[in-house]
């Protein structure tokens, strides 16, 4: 049984550990399990139905949990590969998808919006148009928007991310470095100046561990993946240091080991080679301990 994440040492900045949500059927059971496992909230999509949004907000309050709203723009949410942006969806389409989620995020009291947005194949002018308009939308609606580093999306590699951050000084990002490890086919220490820039603009971290051939190691506890785990932790430390320097009163992190093609399966049987929930709880506990050790007030 996974133990509760119990750490009582006071820290100068609070680390909120979020559980990833993927549209669970029984919201009440999911949130109770989340709370009992020691997580501070969830990161996931917001229901389109107004009554369901009202229920979500109430149940989050009842359980003392926070929410990061997930936006996936330009996709077909009914498709099996719902996370992939469709080629026929235009910049205005992506912006409209983002606007809808941002408005709903305000309604349910989310901390901010995390968005997988844009498309990797867009021309540079389309990328610039999208992010310029998205940042204006952020100001209009009045909720922070954090743009996620993700394959198939605008921020699919370190270099385009660097270039966009240099153009848009108020742009904040969600760093999921596991995707870049696959795109670049290596760990990212060779791109340290870009990692430093990203750290200075990071609002949120998704702490999955990737490596050169896959966006998710099968089990970060295994010794064969220690190099990749320690590399990601170096990069997350860089982000934490920047967030403290920028005066954050709380920082957020989501362990995001997933199924949906991320978790390796045994041939023929299709059985997962490790337990995703167990790994996410282990990762949450490990990162919370590391955070307290580095930033304790005592």
What are these regions (language model features)?
Residues 57-76, 131-142, 167-168, 233-237, ...:
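Alpha-helix-loop-beta-strand connector modules within alpha/beta enzyme cores
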Residues 27-31, 53-58, 124-133, 153-169, ...:
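Distinct, well-ordered alpha-helical segments
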Residues 17, 46-48, 73-76, 117-121, ...:
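Active-site-proximal loop/turn and secondary-structure-junction residues that shape catalytic pockets
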Residues 83-172:
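Active-site acidic/histidine proton-transfer and metal-coordination neighborhood
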Residues 1-100, 106, 281-298:
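N-terminal pre-domain/capping segments
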Residues 2-5, 28, 167-171, 182-298:
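Histidine-acidic metal/acid-base catalytic patches
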Residues 75-95, 119-126, 216-226, 262-272:
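Surface-exposed, active-site-proximal loop segments in enzymatic domains
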Residues 5-19, 42-44, 65-72, 113-115, ...:
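Hydrophobic faces of well-ordered beta-strands that scaffold small-molecule active sites
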């Amino acid at each position: 049984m996974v133990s509760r994440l119990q750490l009582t040492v006071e820290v100068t900045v609070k680390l909120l550990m979020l559980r990833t949500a993927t549209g669970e059927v029984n919201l009440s059971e999911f949130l109770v399990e989340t709370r009992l496992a020691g997580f501070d909230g969830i990161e996931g999509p917001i229901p389109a139905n107004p009554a369901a949004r009202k229920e979500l907000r109430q149940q989050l309050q009842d359980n003392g949990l926070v929410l990061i709203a997930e936006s996936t723009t330009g996709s077909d949410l009914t498709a099996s590969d719902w996370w992939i942006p469709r080629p026929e969806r235009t910049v205005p389409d992506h912006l409209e998808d983002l606007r809808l989620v941002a408005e709903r995020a305000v309604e349910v009291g989310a901390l901010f919006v995390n968005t997988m947005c844009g498309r990797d194949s867009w021309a540079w002018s389309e990328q610039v148009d999208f992010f310029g308009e998205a940042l204006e939308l952020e100001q209009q609606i009045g909720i922070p928007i954090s743009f996620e580093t993700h394959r198939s999306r605008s921020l699919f590699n370190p270099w385009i991310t660097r270039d966009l951050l240099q153009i848009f000084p108020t742009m904040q990002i969600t760093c999921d470095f596991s995707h870049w490890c696959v795109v670049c086919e290596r760990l990212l220490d060779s791109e340290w100046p870009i990692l430093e820039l990203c750290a200075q603009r990071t609002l949120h971290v998704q702490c999955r561990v990737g490596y050169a051939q896959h966006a998710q190691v099968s089990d970060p506890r295994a010794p064969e993946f220690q190099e990749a785990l320690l590399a990601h932790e170096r990069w997350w430390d860089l982000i934490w240091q920047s967030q403290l320097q920028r005066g954050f009163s709380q920082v957020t992190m989501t362990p995001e080991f997933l199924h949906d093609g991320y978790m390796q399966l045994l041939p023929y049987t299709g059985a997962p080679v490790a337990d995703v929930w167990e790994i996410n709880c282990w990762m949450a506990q490990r990162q919370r301990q590391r955070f307290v050790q580095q930033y304790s007030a005592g």
